[in-house]
Amino acid sequence: MKSILNDFLLMIQFFTRIPVNKNLQCEKENFKRGAFFLPVVAFIIGGMEFLIYLGLKNFLPANVIIVLLILFTAMITGGLHMDGLADTCDGFFSLRDKERIIEIMKDSRIGSYGTIALIIDLLLKYQLLYSLVLKGYSIAIVLAPIIGRISILFLCLSKRTAKKNGSGNIFIGNMSKPIIFFITTIVLVLSTYFLGLRATIIPFIGVLLITYLLYLLCLNKINGLTGDTLGACNELGEITFLLILLMM
């Protein structure tokens, strides 16, 4: 029980800015087991967003609430995944060789492509969430972050790391397939309860497809994955899920 709590708190500490005032074991096995809780962390984030939405929907227009929710997400996650998307776009669109691309991705400064990617990411999230709320799919506020993290887990099934050292290496190739498939089944069952089978399966297939295409792009550009590409995967997974759901 103590190790389970350790791994859960480790995921909260690693993926959010929620203060965890506790010394935790941070071995590879802790992260491997802790992957089970990544969608749970996403559920906590999405759940808080949903509660904010419910608390404000009678006082503010939906479009204003969505802006506040996006701001809240950026604050509670430290913009971790958005930063990964920006770094990935800066590197991949630089049209340089592998070594130079990785150097660009490690640079803390944001470039033109990263800026454009963030603007598009935020605009799409805003418009998609706003449109889905108006359509009666406010539950997407909770589901999108969970599906995004699920896509990260699937990407981590690959053992191809682009760097010898990096924060992403503790996840890449270290995920348990049974755990990932078990978590995915639970998430899909819950999503089906709220959205129906068709509105769950088709968007999820789209997310898996985008995840695989990103994987192929990563192999082509840098011969593997990094922590930044995992963050990019989350953002692309969320947007793909929301976009296809809106089309249903």
From Swiss-Prot:
InterPro entries: CobS. One of its GO terms (molecular function) is adenosylcobinamide-GDP ribazoletransferase activity. Pfam families: CobS. GO terms for biological process: cobalamin biosynthetic process. It catalyses: alpha-ribazole + adenosylcob(III)inamide-GDP = adenosylcob(III)alamin + GMP + H(+); alpha-ribazole 5'-phosphate + adenosylcob(III)inamide-GDP = adenosylcob(III)alamin 5'-phosphate + GMP + H(+). The chain crosses the membrane at residues 36-56, 59-79, 114-134, 137-157, 170-190, 199-219. Its EC number is 2.7.8.26. Pathway: Cofactor biosynthesis; adenosylcobalamin biosynthesis; adenosylcobalamin from cob(II)yrinate a,c-diamide: step 7/7. Its main location: membrane. Belongs to the CobS family. This is Adenosylcobinamide-GDP ribazoletransferase. It comes from Clostridium botulinum (strain Langeland / NCTC 10281 / Type F). The gene is cobS.
